[in-house]
Regions:
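A composition-driven surface/loop motif
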Residues: 1-197
Length: 197
C-alpha cells in the first residue's frame, strides 16, 4: 500500500490478497494517489479491489487478470490506452469514483486495448463512472445486468463495445436520471429486456 504514486512496469506477478491487491491510496490529497501500469503480467485474486488508486489509474500495456474481486479496477479516473484486461467482480467491474474529488476529475476513458468485464448478480455495473465515460478505441466486452452507469456524459467515437455479446452503437446509461442522454440517443426502445419491471 503506497500513498502518493505507484509505477509498475515490466513485471510478472501473481497476487492473492485478503483485501485490496494492488493499491495506492491518499485520502487527504486527491491530486496524488496515482498508479501507472505498463508491460506487466498480473494475475490477481482480491478480497476487495483488484487494482485500486485513490487518484488517476493509467494502464498503457500488459496483461491483467482479476479473477476474483469485489471491484476489479477502481480509481478517481481510469484511463486505458492499451493492454489486455479481464475482470470478474461481485460488485462493479470498473469503478471511477472518489468521494473527495470534483466530478470533472472523475472519469473513465478507453483509448485502446481489450477490456473484458463480468460482474455478479444484483445491483452491479460492469463500468460505473461517477463522472464522464469516453471510448475512442479498443474493444470492450461487458457481461452483466447492465453495461454502463455514469453520472456525467458519454462520448463514443471509436472502438467496439459489446454488452452480453451484443454490439452497441452508442453508450446507454443503465441508470435512468443519470447524466442525460448520451449523444442525444433518446430512449432505447424495445431492446432486450424491454420495459424494466
Amino acid at each position: 500500500n503506497v500513498n502518493d504514486e505507484l509505477n509498475i512496469t515490466g513485471t510478472t506477478m501473481t497476487i492473492d490478497a485478503d483485501e485490496d491487491a494492488v493499491k495506492v491510496d491518499n485520502d487527504e490529497d486527491t491530486s496524488v494517489g496515482t498508479m501507472y501500469l505498463s508491460d506487466n503480467k498480473m494475475t490477481i485474486t482480491a478480497g476487495d479491489d483488484g487494482i485500486h488508486a485513490s487518484g488517476d489509474l493509467i494502464i498503457d500495456s500488459g496483461t491483467y487478470q482479476v479473477t476474483e474481486s469485489v471491484e476489479g479496477l477502481e480509481g478517481k479516473s481510469i484511463t486505458i490506452n492499451g493492454g489486455d484486461i479481464t475482470i470478474y467482480a461481485t460488485d462493479d467491474g470498473v469503478n471511477a469514483a472518489n468521494a473527495n474529488a470534483n466530478q470533472d476529475e472523475i472519469f473513465f476513458t478507453m483509448n485502446g486495448g481489450t477490456l473484458n468485464v463480468e460482474v455478479g448478480q444484483g445491483d452491479t455495473d460492469p463500468i460505473d463512472s461517477n463522472g464522464n465515460v469516453t471510448v475512442t478505441g479498443g474493444t470492450i466486452n461487458l457481461t452483466g445486468q447492465s453495461g454502463f452507469d455514469f453520472d456525467g456524459t458519454a462520448t463514443y467515437t471509436g472502438g467496439d463495445i459489446y454488452i452480453n455479446g451484443e454490439k452497441q452503437t452508442e453508450i446507454v446509461n443503465s441508470m435512468p436520471g443519470g447524466g442525460g442522454a448520451p449523444g442525444g440517443g433518446g430512449p432505447q426502445g424495445g431492446g432486450p429486456g424491454g420495459g424494466h419491471p
